[in-house]
Amino acid sequence: MANNKNEQIILEQLKDSTLRNAAFSTIVELYSKKIYWHIRNMVLSHDDANDLVQDTFIKAWNNIESFRGDSQISTWLYRIAINETLAFLKKRNIETVSIDSEEHDFAETIESDAYFCGDATDILFRKAINTLPEKQRLVFNMKYFEEMRYEEISEILGTSIGALKASYHIAVKKIETIIKESD
């Protein structure tokens, strides 16, 4: 990630129309992998995650002039990625016929995914995470996989730190219960 000095340079370059393309390319280079994994922890397939990363950066590019720099670039990108991902998940949930078929699809997708390299325990763990409500899953993924601080998550999601801690704690308990029940 960019440090504050680099971020200030990038922000200045974004304001200059002759440097904007290069500055945005730097942003994509710095953040695309983190945004991909953030999204990938929310959606099942590599292709969907890639599409959502592209949608995130397209939306960022289209709105770059409205970015005032009140927050870090990464915070702004995560917010866009979250909105794009949640919209995708809502659309998918409307199209999903049954929960049983979704769980079957999840198992099939993750086991056949060339980008997934986990064992049976990891598959069970991912299945347990997938049962969490979207917002809880989002908080869990940001804290557990991305090792974000509650302050960062709070800024991105616009939720109090106390609520985030409670959500994470409940998510952990649900995951533990699901894993214990499968033994």
Regions of interest found by a model, annotated:
Residues 44, 57-72, 92:
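Sigma70-family region 2
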Residues 3-9, 95-118:
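Internal acidic/polar
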Residues 51-58, 71-83:
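Structural recognition of an alpha-helix C-terminal capping motif at a helix-to-coil junction
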